[in-house]
Amino acid sequence: MTDASRASSSGHGDTVGDLTTGSRRLVGQVRVVGSGLLGASIGLRLRQHGVDVILDYVSPAARSLAVDYGAGRLPAEGDAPVLVVVAVPPDVTSEIVARELASWPDALVTDVASVKVAPLAELRARGADVSRYIGSHPMAGRERGGAVSARADLFVGRPWVIAGHDDITYRRAAAVEDLALDLGATPIEMTPEEHDAGVALVSHAPQVVASLMATRLRDAPDAALGLAGQGVRDVTRIAGSDPALWTQILGANASRVAAVLSELRADLDRVVDALEAPDAPGSRRTLAESIGSGNGGVARLPGKHGQQTQFSSVIVMVDDTPGQLARLLTEIGEIGVNLEDLRLEHSPGAQLGLAEVSIVPEQEDRLVTELEARGWTVVGAFA
């Protein structure tokens, strides 16, 4: 079993406790090239551990902003990083990685780009020393980028893919795993090919679907948009992403994303055919099977601790006044129920909202009883 596999299967991946005690695995300077959301978030967490973080980026303004936010310091004479993390857009990742490999011959270099096959192939084509390069990718992010959106806890509990390859011979190759663990993430080993196929399915194709669905809203009547509830908001939540960045990501993983979307297109064609002739034999079965297949797929998504878990939802009415949501969350904690997920939905034209609280089924009855006893209006509960 590899080091990263041991970490994620032996309890070593339970990193939150390690972070709160201030322990760390990385020893030595870490150089972060890139001062956006990921680069600055990496710097913020490592600085909390006392790591000497060196920030560098092509934009002096962006770099200075990240430094001001406490994500690291400016480069200085005598720097000797043991690990270099490249956090730049995908279209320049291989170029910057090659430069860093040449500039720091005693350092391991990793990147956090959202594709892994293309950078490795480009580095080999450049003749770069890939024995000291390991691609990686944290499955974490936010809708808005830049250092101003950075968070020290961005990676806590999130998968961090380590995409190794056969040419790695560097003696301190485990430093990428140490980085992931110090950031609170769970290291997962994959080949570059496995990674790119996986993210095409769970990240890249969903971005396209969200954007295309949101496009349908551009010219929709105001009256129709006024009916929007949580369903359309869930489907389009990531549609506000950066077009320039996503053009690079999709282009770098084009064939794999196209394969997923081609399967989706075939399913959509079947649904459209059924809707155009709803009374034709088999049409209603097609519709039912489409919805049912989706039930099966979403049930396979892991919960926040990585396991596949069925949660119960308790829907609570919350007044749209300052402090009400905070009071609800505080009282759920006082009751002793662990919150697995939370969704909010505002009723158009009403001074209230609905909080959908996800919990393990065994705690549903107790939570409903305790909340109602404390004066909350529970409008529904279901598995």
For each feature predicted by the language model, list its residue ranges:
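Glycine-rich Rossmann-fold phosphate-binding loop(s) that bind the pyrophosphate
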Residues: 35-36
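Rossmann-like NAD(P)-binding element
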Residues: 77-108
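Rossmann-like NAD(P)(H) cofactor-binding subdomain of soluble oxidoreductases
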Residues: 96-147
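Internal alpha-helical scaffold of NAD(P)-dependent oxidoreductase catalytic cores
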Residues: 154-240
